[in-house]
Structures are given as C-alpha cells and as structure tokens.
Amino acid sequence: MSDEGYRELVESKSAPTTPGPWSPDRERWKRHEAAWKQHCSWSHGLWCHCHDWTRHLKKETRECGSGTESGEDPAVSFDLVDDAAMLAAAGDAEPGAAGGGGVEVPKGPAPTLTTHAIRDLNQYKSQTQPPPLETSYTPGMWMLPELYQPQNSNNSWKDLVTGNRNRNRDPPRPSYLRERRRRSSTTTARRPRAMTSTPETPRKRRRTTRTRAGFERALTSLLEGLGVSEDSDSSSERDCWPF
C-alpha cells in the first residue's frame, strides 16, 4: 500500500477532533497513530534524505517538496498530533513537561505493562520486526532448508539422485567400498593377439533338450541310468519293468 492510500485509510478512521472522556478505543487509536508516525519516519529515511516525511503526504511522486500546488502546508492540513502529546495521552508524561503546548489530551489512568506507549524507534523496530531465525539445530526441531540444501549449482539435486558424492557434504565411504570402486574403475586391458594366431574359442553353449539331438541325449542317459541298452528287445527285460 502506498503512502497516499495509507493516509486516506488513516483519515477515514481518525479519532474525533473534540477531546472526550478517556476510553480504551481512544487510547488504542492514539498509540496506533504514534506507532504509525514512527514507522513513517523510519521507512521514509530508507529512500529519501529530506528528513521530513510529512512533505510527501499530498504528493503523488516521491520527490521532496516544501508544499502542494495550492500553497497549504500538508503537515498542517493533515492535523498531526505532536509526539509529546501522544505520549501524554497514553498517560506516561505530563503535557506541560513534555512540551505538548496547548494541545488538549484526554485524561485517564496510566497504561498497564502490556499496553505501553512507544518511546523510540528502536523499541518500535523490536516490536514490529519478526524475531531472528534459529540457525542452530536443537533436538526435536526440524532443520531449516538453508542448512541442508546444497548452495552450489555444481552440487545440485542431480548429485543426490545419481549417487555422486560431494566431498564437503557426504560422509566418507567405508574401506571395502572404496576398494571395490577402485577395482571397477581400473580395467586391465587384454593383450592384443597376433594376426596369425587362432581366434578365441567361443564359450560352450548350454545343452538343452528342446532339439531332436537333445531329446536323444536325454533318452540315452535315462536308459543308461536304468541299465537298459537300446538294442535289447528281449521280453524278459521288458517284463521286469513296473510300467
């Protein structure tokens, strides 16, 4: 939200001009207005060096100027309340001692410890800014992504998927794995054979029984195991079979 839009929002919710009796809503509004003024002065110092953030209230651009085209002072037209008067309205100081001048402030009891007025910019920063992140690991707490995600582009998620080790991230491998890796990486080259030598004999194929020769070999070995020869056709040997 821009400064102009936030100013319109504040003006639409502004407190009544005539001071009335003390009320929690009025006190809450005064504290909100004081905190908003502290925030405006702090954020204005980040991008401008004129040291007067009230000059930008009625200007569309962020260029420093002494006033608007009509000649009226934006600080006066906005009807801002002095810081001392705001603190006095919260009950922490007297209007005369704080330099509030002739500004009338509502009377009321002093605020409690839970609702106190903002005195300086450092107090406003400490109350509005989020707490710093926990960078140290404590038991029972999830670690932050910045602590275990690789920061270097060379050590990206591909190293985690493909199994490539990172010397700075991963623990060292055991000795037996290092030896296995070394043996697999160093391949012994075969000695080249002479052109006149005989070629290497291929490995023997596995004998199967799916061919005619395989069936004949299986039948022959079965008959040899039973003690029966192929050329014996005597009825005495056939009758002794149980099948």
UniProtKB/Swiss-Prot annotation:
It comes from the Viruses. Residues 185-200 have a biased composition (Low complexity). Residues 1-11, 167-178 have a biased composition (Basic and acidic residues). Residues 1-26, 146-243 are annotated as: Disordered. This is Uncharacterized ORF2 protein. The lineage of its organism: Viruses, Viruses incertae sedis, Anelloviridae, Thetatorquevirus, Thetatorquevirus canid1.
